[in-house]
Curated annotation (Swiss-Prot):
Annotated S-S bridges: C82-C135, C165-C249, C191-C244, C196-C207
Species this chain originates from: Rotavirus A (isolate RVA/Pig/Australia/BMI-1/1989/G4P9[7]) (RV-A)
Region (LVD motif): 237-239
Assigned protein family: Belongs to the rotavirus VP7 family.
This protein's name: Outer capsid glycoprotein VP7
Note in the entry: Some rotavirus strains are neuraminidase-sensitive and require sialic acid to attach to the cell surface. Some rotavirus strains are integrin-dependent. Some rotavirus strains depend on ganglioside for their entry into the host cell. Hsp70 also seems to be involved in the entry of some strains.
Top-level taxonomic group: Viruses
Length: 326
């Protein structure tokens, strides 16, 4: 009887030792596998980061995520550039392959084929209403035309800054501007804006609220007018509503991914003197007028210097939305 008990105890003891040995062996094997896999992953990760040139990334528009390039200093490999030009340029060049030619020339300056977009507009009015500034960098070419200096200057103020606007019902309400950043922006084929300042009794100051002929004219037959009046004073407005709209807008700050190149003209239009323009950084420049080919060649030559005074936006931005936001 005692022999059987000793045999049973010995059997369990040997089994325990054997199982312990198996578990230790399995643990060593698993540790070896885990360490080896971890080492391989670290080595492969290091090698893959060193080879991440980013050249094969598809560039189809502004990207929400900025793709960092650890081995390439050229910032334009992951950027998009939009070039806006008047219809006159395409008509004068009269070459079906002119955009391809310019794309190849931009390539010599570090802008890959497919990263530069050419956008045509017919006139200042059309462009101011719906500019569609979608790219990381947006360069607008504006041909200087005598008699349109004011429209061009106000277009520059419009697209070089971000605005938050609300509709105005001038038939029911009086309006006042609350500060230097608060303007009334009027757009249309022909905008004439008249105002009548009011005192605390809502009586006209130097004008009669019931007689539009006595109102003060602040914009006359303009396509685009940014109206500035005395702050904190109520005004009754009269606008050519059949050909024009007007909105109450606040300037939020500079739109730093936009630059304007004035083509021709004796002097460059300067909007930096406006106290609401902050910071006072010039993003308007002028090139001499010769032929449109010469203008585009100049832009290609200096494009990298131009974007140095701009700030890249990593997301698409429809500039026209500023005018219709409520």
């Amino acid at each position: 009887m005692y022999g059987i008990e000793y045999t049973t105890v010995l059997f369990y003891l040997i089994s325990f030792v054997f199982v312990s040995y198996i578990l230790k062996t399995v643990t060593k094997i698993m540790d070896f596998i885990i360490y080896r896999i971890t080492f391989i992953i670290i080595v492969l990760s290091t090698l893959s980061n060193a080879q991440n040139y980013g050249i094969n990334l598809p560039i189809t528009g502004s990207m929400d995520t900025a793709y960092a390039n650890s081995t390439q200093n050229d910032n334009f490999l992951s950027s998009t550039l939009c070039l806006y030009y008047p219809t006159e340029a395409r008509t004068q060049i009269n070459d079906n392959e002119w955009k391809d030619t310019l794309s190849q020339l931009f390539l010599t300056k570090g802008w890959p084929t497919g990263s530069v977009y050419f956008n045509e507009y017919s006139n200042i009015l059309e462009f101011s209403i719906d500019p569609k500034l979608y790219c990381d960098y947006n360069v607008v070419l504006i041909k200087f035309t005598s008699g349109q200096e004011l429209d061009i200057s106000e277009l520059a103020d419009l697209i070089l800054n971000e605005w938050l606007c609300n509709p105005m019902d001038i038939t029911l309400y009086y309006y006042q501007q609350t500060g230097e950043a608060n303007k009334w922006i009027s757009m249309g084929s022909s905008c004439t804006v008249k105002v009548c300042p009011l005192n605390t009794q809502t009586l006209g100051i130097g004008c009669q609220t019931t007689n539009v002929a006595t109102f003060e004219t602040v914009a006359d037959s303009e396509k685009l007018a940014i109206v500035d009046v005395v702050d904190s004073v109520n005004h009754k407005l009269d606008v050519t509503s059949t050909t024009c709209t007007i909105r109450n807008c606040n300037k939020l700050g500079p739109r730093e991914n936009v630059a304007i190149i004035q083509v021709g003209g004796s002097n460059i239009l300067d909007i930096t003197a406006d106290p609401t323009t902050s910071p006072q950084i010039e993003r308007m420049m002028r090139v001499n007028w010769k032929k449109w080919w010469q203008v585009f060649y100049t832009v290609v030559d200096y494009i990298n210097q131009i974007v140095q005074v701009m700030s890249k936006r990593s997301r698409s931005l429809d500039s026209s939305s500023f005018y219709y936001r409520v």
